[in-house]
Amino acid sequence: MMSNQTVYQFIAENQNELLQLWTDTLKELSEQESYQLTDQVYENISKEYIDILLLSVKDENAAESQISELALRAVQIGLSMKFLATALAEFWKRLYTKMNDKRLPDQESTELIWQIDRFFSPINTEIFNQYSISWEKTVSLQKIALQELSAPLIPVFENITVMPLVGTIDTERAKRIMENLLNGVVKHRSQVVLIDITGVPVVDTMVAHHIIQASEAVRLVGAKCLLAGIRPEIAQTIVNLGIDLSQVITKNTLQKGIQTALEMTDRKIVSLGE
């Protein structure tokens, strides 16, 4: 059987040519996918992959961190799984072409193909595995960031904070609203919290229930809750559904809500004379 040293030597001897061939292939594939990346990026990816191959031939477990880094980089620059799979398949074609150019005896050529594939296949499998892990982590972080943006608590005056809500409110988002409210009240030492629902399209029984719960939770940590943005259609819906908001201070606009919040903290907005 052909030794690892023979495989290493074959890849090393053809490294520069393989690097150029695969870099050119990546550029061609990127044009089909409309990726806007520099030539240096593709050259770096090609070099990293060939280095991983060479390192793995010496020690099968030595390139684990490099494989993870390559997969993470592919995710970060936006390369799709399809692009990655096609690119790796093209690399094997280029490698096979180089073996044919050597015009090795059939037996020797077969052994070389088998031996290279022994390293090539597990590496590719691990790259796809690490790509999936990196992608899931990235999506998870993006989801957390979006969740934070979906219920931000903003300090507007000393001891007064506003939570502007836009879009529908489901159970999961309601939990985030509650969590951010309670943490924010403590963090900003809020005395009054305004929940602005101007951008909430529908206020049904469930949404109202979540708002009442949030208001009660804010009261329990020593602050007062004020609901702003009660549009006429929402007011009508609340009345028709028999929703009791008597324990919550309500205002039809955020401006009036802020004026009330200032009054509740012994302040007011005044006009300066000329």
UniProtKB/Swiss-Prot annotation:
Q: How is it modified after translation?
A: Phosphorylated by RsbT. This threonine phosphorylation abrogates the ability of RsbRA to stimulate RsbT in vitro.
Q: Is Transmembrane helix there in the keyword field?
A: no
Swapping T171D leads to an effect described as:
Decrease in induction of sigma-B activity in response to a salt stress. In absence of the other RsbR paralogs no change in stress response
Q: Which residues form the STAS domain?
A: 150-265
Q: Name one GO molecular function term.
A: oxygen binding
Disruption of the gene: reported phenotype: Cells lacking this gene have a decreased response to salt stress, indicating that RsbRA is a positive regulator of sigma-B activity. Its activity is dependent on RsbRB.
Which Pfam families does the protein's record reference?
Answer: Rsbr_N, STAS
Q: Give the keywords, sorted.
A: Phosphoprotein
The record describes its quaternary structure and partners as: Interacts with RsbRB and RsbS in the stressosome. The stressosome probably also contains RsbRC and RsbRD.
Name this protein carries in UniProt: RsbT co-antagonist protein RsbRA
Q: Which organism is it from?
A: Bacillus subtilis (strain 168)
Q: Which gene encodes it?
A: rsbRA
